[in-house]
Amino acid sequence: MREIVHLQTGQCGNQIGAAFWQNISGEHGLDSNGVYNGTSELQLERMSVYFNEASGNKYVPRAVLVDLEPGTMDAVRAGPFGQLFRPDNFVFGQSGAGNNWAKGHYTEGAELVDQVLDVVRREAEGCDCLQGFQITHSLGGGTGAGMGTLLISKIREEFPDRMMATFSVVPSPKVSDTVVEPYNATLSVHQLVENSDETFCIDNEALYDICMRTLKLSNPSYGDLNHLVSAVMSGVTTCLRFPGQLNSDLRKLAVNMVPFPRLHFFMVGFAPLTSRGAHSFRAVSVPELTQQMFDPKNMMAASDFRNGRYLTCSAIFRGKVAMKDVEDQMRNVQNKNSSYFVEWIPNNVQTALCSIPPRGLKMSSTFVGNATAIQELFKRVGEQFTAMFRRKAFLHWYTGEGMDEMEFTEAESNMNDLVSEYQQYQDAGVDEEEEEYEEEAPLEEEV
């Protein structure tokens, strides 16, 4: 039944991944050892999308955990859901990539990649009808960015017709981990543009803002941030894991969301936002969800869609929701804010419904938007990249691993192209093409 194989690479990827598995295990009624003790048949119906059934009523995630150093893996293994994963699926090196993209992509990571692909192959063979892969990683580091993109391109070679979704944590302007983030991110985007089918952009700063502003947490931990990300990941995949009236899968999402193959970088949001351990003290309605979902403060990437326009967007509602309410609200949003949607894609808002809400909520909604404003994110990284690359700062770390300066130049221009493509479609109107032909016609007569 349409399985998904999940990979998590690097420290960030493994921590987000661990939060995700903890989240969906709970939704499917699995305890921390993967034993089912749920209450509803619906939890079992499509368990096989993410879990293999082992002996003794135990379910094992189809997850491959990858890192170039053992530290994070040990933390996951010692964590509350560490016993869930298949021990053979932990693949790790000893040396670490040291936040160096070249180490992850060309040297250290390349040595480990065949081992990882063996595990991926084994997981894929255990599938009935594999739908695709999802990978969680960050773009600012060495392993998640360098080795993550290497894995994506290798998997692409071997499974060219399967979907490839990535949950990518983009370096944020204020919360910076290392000085070479702009290099790593630009080199990664260069890969993602070519090899991923859908990339959900998440950014730590936006997550911090949500924690401080909406959830009123004075000092958010990474645990809180990962909790938010796992809510979105669970929402995006909810249609695959539970029956619903209007189901969508990774491929349907891509068909509806990606008007031009290179423009597959999405902004995500989730509503209602509740802080961990404190469930909302009031009922949530569809209009309220819709309003919160389209609120720029709710986006998990630091770019404001009001500076651009939506090409397409998709809303996934969960819980006991009337189809009509949802349709009305969505139409309402489009009519009131028509200037924020490009007019040359009619019906560019897609909705999906699933009857099972997340734990502890009556209803929830997940938002996925393909907005031209995402270019702000790439612009920001691009400016930082240029500032350093102009001086050739820190380049020796990369050339020392066998990279060429040419690769940096290519990655930079590819990212700049991406930005200008977004800009071009933001400015495009409905009848521009016709005008062009009218202007060209008289020229031929003069000749």
Swiss-Prot record:
Family annotation (InterPro entries): Beta-tubulin_BS, Beta_tubulin, Tub_FtsZ_C, Tubulin, Tubulin/FtsZ-like_C, Tubulin/FtsZ_2-layer-sand-dom, Tubulin/FtsZ_GTPase_sf, Tubulin_C
Protein origin, superkingdom: Eukaryota
UniProt-recorded Gene Ontology molecular function terms: GTP binding; GTPase activity; metal ion binding; structural constituent of cytoskeleton
GTP-binding as UniProt keyword: yes
Cofactor: Mg(2+)
Chief localisation class: cytoplasm
GO CC annotation terms, alphabetical: cytoplasm; microtubule
Region Disordered: start-end pairs: 426-447
Keyword field: Antibiotic resistance, Cytoplasm, Cytoskeleton, GTP-binding, Magnesium, Metal-binding, Microtubule, Nucleotide-binding
Compartment annotation: Cytoplasm, Cytoskeleton
Stretches with biased composition (Acidic residues): 429-447
Residues involved in GTP binding: Q11, E69, S138, G142, T143, G144, N204, N226
GO biological-process terms attached to the record: microtubule-based process; response to antibiotic
Binding site for Mg(2+): E69
Function summary: Tubulin is the major constituent of microtubules, a cylinder consisting of laterally associated linear protofilaments composed of alpha- and beta-tubulin heterodimers. Microtubules grow by the addition of GTP-tubulin dimers to the microtubule end, where a stabilizing cap forms. Below the cap, tubulin dimers are in GDP-bound state, owing to GTPase activity of alpha-tubulin.
Annotated family: Belongs to the tubulin family.
Assembly: Dimer of alpha and beta chains. A typical microtubule is a hollow water-filled tube with an outer diameter of 25 nm and an inner diameter of 15 nM. Alpha-beta heterodimers associate head-to-tail to form protofilaments running lengthwise along the microtubule wall with the beta-tubulin subunit facing the microtubule plus end conferring a structural polarity. Microtubules usually have 13 protofilaments but different protofilament numbers can be found in some organisms and specialized cells.
Name listed for the protein in its UniProt record: Tubulin beta-2 chain
Biological source species: Colletotrichum gloeosporioides (Anthracnose fungus)
